[in-house]
Structure formats: C-alpha cells, structure tokens
Curated annotation (Swiss-Prot):
GO molecular function, one term: DNA binding
Function: Binds to DNA and alters its conformation. May be involved in regulation of gene expression, nucleoid organization and DNA protection.
Domain of life, per lineage: Bacteria
Annotated Gene Ontology cellular component terms: bacterial nucleoid; cytosol
Subcellular location, record wording: Cytoplasm, Nucleoid
Keywords assigned: Cytoplasm, DNA-binding
Subunit structure: Homodimer.
Designated name of the protein: Nucleoid-associated protein CYA_1369
Amino acid sequence: MTRGFGPFGKIQEALKKAQEVRDGAQRLQKELEEMEIVGEAGNGLVKVTVNGNQEPLKVSLDPQVLQEPVDVVEDLLLTAMVNAYTQSAETMRKRMEELTGNISLPGLGLG
C-alpha cells in the first residue's frame, strides 16, 4: 500500500515492478535459449534451425538439393537463414513486449 508514503511509496512500487521485469527477463532468456525455430527454403529442401536468440543450431539439406548448382544451394541456404532469423527476432520482440507491455512505473513518466 502506497498511501501515506508519498514519493517513497511510488519508488517502492516502481522497484517492485522493476524486480518483476527482471525476474521475467531471466525466465524469458532461458525460454529463448531452449526454443528451436526453423527457417525453410526450396519447399523444405533446406532448413536452418536457430534458437530464440538467433543463434544457429543446425542446418539440414535434403540430398536432392545437392544436385543443384552451387549458386542455387547458396541462395536457398541464405533464404532459409534469413527466414529463421526473422522468425526468431519477431518471436523475441513479441515475448519482450508481453513482458514489458503492461508495466508502468508510476510517477516516473515511463508507463
């Protein structure tokens, strides 16, 4: 309860909310590290897997794609990488928004 404490109550409430965000961020970090997001190209012939922090985990090539010219394989690999990275970055953005979206820090003009 912040009544009667004036600015001190607001500071205490802000510190409590900051701790909640910190705890949530730690949980989110672990969740992102464990997440696997797959980017594909060439109708699934090339797959790149990254975690929620955009760190590469695995590349998978269908043997059929190796019959293509090198430049085609390179383009497919790049497309799959960009796809995986984009999905991962969007997932991270949404999760961070969920974590901080409802946080307002009273009296500090931040919420």
